[in-house]
């Protein structure tokens, strides 16, 4: 499996992709691209995406390719998201092993999912995106590897890991007023995300950390 991380437009990536493919000889490629083209030029580069997919299969005809759309921010990216599934389907209909990954289905919260720069994802946002990648790819990857065991959930449950204990925001093994205070300070932006355990702070498992989680934790503490 090859993963190349590089900021750039579709033409910039296309100018390097042949070398990357020949150097790394991947079985699987994850392609998440085109957002920079839209932001830099204001135009949807559908033709560029289509040509890049063809270029990948020309160099590596037997590769398995996953092509993703974008989380719905900024608003302009939605017009690009609208054309990606059709391009992928066209290639699949032509016999290419290409699959669409719908990252736009993220339960998006701009307040928690976007980083300080107002554009890229925060740790919370990337965690959500990683779970969607997992959801759309795991069964196909297992089939490629010849595995048949059931697909596990992308999000751990309290029985999966001793670190998962809802309300234990500071990971001290207890759920008490210290966790409530820390969670409240995070909501008020007194401390940053590195000060809390995101999984344990998301009390209702909706992918967001907000006043609702504060209320749930408060009710739990009052019952205790």
UniProtKB/Swiss-Prot annotation:
Keyword Nucleotidyltransferase carried by entry: no
GO biological process terms held by the UniProt record: cellulose catabolic process
Domain Dockerin: 162-224
EC number: 3.2.1.4
Region span, Disordered: 147-168
Domain of life: Bacteria
Record carries keyword Hydrolase: yes
Reactions it catalyzes: Endohydrolysis of (1->4)-beta-D-glucosidic linkages in cellulose, lichenin and cereal beta-D-glucans
Keywords: Carbohydrate metabolism, Cellulose degradation, Glycosidase, Hydrolase, Polysaccharide degradation
Bilayer-crossing regions: none
Gene Ontology molecular function, alphabetical: cellulase activity; lysophospholipase activity
Function: This enzyme catalyzes the endohydrolysis of 1,4-beta-glucosidic linkages in cellulose, lichenin and cereal beta-D-glucans.
The protein, known as: Putative endoglucanase X
Gene: celX
């Amino acid at each position: 499996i090859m993963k190349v991380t590089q900021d750039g437009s579709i033409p910039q990536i296309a100018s390097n992709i042949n070398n990357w493919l020949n150097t790394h000889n991947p079985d699987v490629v994850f392609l998440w691209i085109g957002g920079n083209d839209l932001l830099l030029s204001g135009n949807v580069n559908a033709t560029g995406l289509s040509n890049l997919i063809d270029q990948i299969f020309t160099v590596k005809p037997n590769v398995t390719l996953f092509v993703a759309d974008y989380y719905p921010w900024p608003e302009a990216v939605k017009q690009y998201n609208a054309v990606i599934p059709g391009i992928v389907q066209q290639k699949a209909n032509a016999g290419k092993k290409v699959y669409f990954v719908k990252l736009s289905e993220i339960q998006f919260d701009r307040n928690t999912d976007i980083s300080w720069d107002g554009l890229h994802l925060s740790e919370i946002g990337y965690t959500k995106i990683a779970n969607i990648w997992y959801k759309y790819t795991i069964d196909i990857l297992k089939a490629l590897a010849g595995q048949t065991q059931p697909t596990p959930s992308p999000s751990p449950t309290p029985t999966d890991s001793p670190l998962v204990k809802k309300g234990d925001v500071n990971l001290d093994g207890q759920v008490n007023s210290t966790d409530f205070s820390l969670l409240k300070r995070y909501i008020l932006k007194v401390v940053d995300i590195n000060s809390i355990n995101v999984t344990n702070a998301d009390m209702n498992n909706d992918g967001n950390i907000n006043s609702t989680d504060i209320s749930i934790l408060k009710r739990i503490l009052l019952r205790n």
